[in-house]
């Protein structure tokens, strides 16, 4: 009985330590996401920002998210929307390998922060991420001007 209680206490302590570690990683990575948000906000002030974003996105993805760690599926890249899915993610794979898959969600959250800097000209949307249990990480960058023109 005593050993069982000790085992439960140890598991509870370990869970608290993991939660604390995840929160510390969240705090630190959000700092970088906020810097990216500011940089995106500066970029978004430029005229024709969606066209420029669209012209550079595939090169950016190939350079910064290479095929060795990420499997990118391009769905759409036109004047209305840039949409691609990541079918595999190096961040998720590393988190799983190290026994902490829940950590990956922290990195996923930072996309929402960083890309919010593109508003109001470019709206970022997503239905889910691999880290949250979805089949893929979907990235939708919507040209807000084109969307507004439709209505």
Write out the residue ranges for each language-model feature.
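N-terminal, charged low-complexity regulatory/assembly segments
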Residues: 1-12
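Terminal "cap-and-tail" regions of soluble proteins that handle hydrophobic small molecules
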Residues: 3-4, 23, 147-151
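C-terminal non-catalytic interaction appendages of large macromolecular assemblies
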Residues: 80, 90-94, 98-151
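Amphipathic interaction/junction segments at domain boundaries or subunit interfaces
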Residues: 12-99, 112
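A short, highly charged nucleic-acid-interacting micro-segment common to nuclease
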Residues: 1-3, 46, 101
């Amino acid at each position: 009985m005593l050993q069982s209680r000790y085992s439960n206490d140890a598991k509870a302590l370990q869970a608290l330590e993991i939660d604390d570690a995840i929160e510390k990683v969240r705090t630190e990575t959000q700092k970088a996401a906020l810097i990216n948000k500011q940089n995106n906000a500066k970029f978004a002030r430029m005229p024709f920002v969606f066209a420029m974003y669209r012209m550079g996105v595939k090169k950016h993805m190939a350079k910064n998210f290479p095929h060795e760690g990420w499997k990118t599926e391009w769905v759409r890249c036109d004047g209305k929307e840039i949409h691609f899915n990541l079918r595999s993610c190096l961040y998720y794979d590393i988190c799983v390998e190290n026994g902490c898959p829940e950590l990956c969600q922290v990195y996923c959250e930072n996309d929402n922060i960083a890309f919010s800097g593109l508003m109001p000209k470019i709206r970022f949307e997503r239905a889910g991420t691999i880290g949250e249990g979805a089949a893929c990480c979907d990235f939708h960058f919507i040209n807000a001007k084109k969307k507004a023109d439709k209505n």
